[in-house]
A protein has these predicted regions:
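Flexible coil/turn and secondary-structure edge motifs
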Residues: 1-147
């Protein structure tokens, strides 16, 4: 099993979309990239923690590659808007790929380069080493499935 951690706006919609991909065996929403190893939704919404809302995926690379996950990532959000997705604005809604190793970093950079030619605006998606990931509160997990 491998892990991918991706920021692409409010985590509720992307979580359900990623959960339907063949090869994704588990999803979890959380916060990543911030100043501390623990935080809350309320704190993240202040914009002072520097965390992004993210979806963490456990996936089987024999069924789906990290590259295919990233291509899907670019299909389901607008990577050309800075710190916003749809009606949501703030640094917690930024487009960001959090890599776990050099191989994921290289793949991320290549996919961004390839995807840049598909969009009319420049992709603003950041790539960063995973830092201070923590799961979101239970009520956020599988939020849209519970409704």
């Amino acid at each position: 099993m491998e892990i991918a951690i991706l920021g692409l706006g409010c985590f509720w919609g992307p979580e359900i979309k990623f959960s339907k991909l063949d090869g994704v065996v588990k999803t979890e929403v959380g916060y990543c990239g911030g100043n501390s190893s623990e935080t809350t939704y309320k704190e993240v919404c202040t914009g002072t923690t520097n965390h992004a809302e993210v979806v963490k995926l456990d996936f089987d690379p024999k069924i789906i590659s990290y590259e295919k996950i990233l291509k899907f990532f670019f299909e389901i959000h607008d990577p050309t808007t800075l710190n916003s997705q749809g009606p949501d604005f703030g640094t917690q809604y930024r487009s960001e790929i959090f890599y776990l190793n050099d191989q994921q970093k290289e793949i991320s950079e290549k996919v961004i380069e390839d995807e840049n030619i598909k969009f009319s605006g420049k992709i603003v998606t950041k790539t960063s080493l995973v830092k201070n990931y923590c799961p979101a509160e239970e009520y956020h997990q599988k939020y849209l499935e519970k409704r």
